[in-house]
Regions:
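Long terminal segments
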Residues: 2-35, 41-43, 51, 58-60, ...
Length: 126
């Protein structure tokens, strides 16, 4: 499935403020280094209590905890909802944009699938 290329890559807002971190082991932390969840190498998405809250399939399909498809992450970085409406894009340089190409933030060095899960599917927004 994906991985952060370097331990502790920053997730940043569009004004470069740090909003969190994605570690190479899949741990997702907020800006205060509190663990908010995990993305496992098998695609399982877990909250901070290790409860499974979703799945990333090898083909880029994103599912909720009940295996309902909620979106897709295409190989080119396009992110779509379950109805194939474009939500945004994760560019190869880590820039994350909405469907109108406005920059939402940055996830440089973070696998685009993981970045899409954090920015578009809100698994870790409590």
């Amino acid at each position: 499935i994906g991985a952060a290329s370097v331990f502790g890559q920053k997730i940043q807002s569009n004004n470069y403020g740090t909003t969190g971190y994605v570690n190479a082991d899949g741990k997702i932390q907020d800006a205060s280094y509190r663990t908010v969840g995990y993305i496992k190498s098998d695609g399982k998405i877990q909250d901070n209590s290790y409860r499974t809250i979703g799945y990333i399939k090898s083909d880029g399909t994103i599912q909720d905890a009940s295996y309902r498809t909620i979106g897709y992450i295409k190989s080119d970085g396009k992110v779509q909802d379950a109805s194939y409406r474009t939500l945004g894009y994760v560019k190869s340089d880590g820039t994350v944009q909405d469907a109108s190409y406005r920059t939402l933030g940055y996830a440089k060095g973070v696998d685009k699938t993981w970045a899409a899960v954090v920015f578009f599917f809100f698994f870790f927004n409590g």
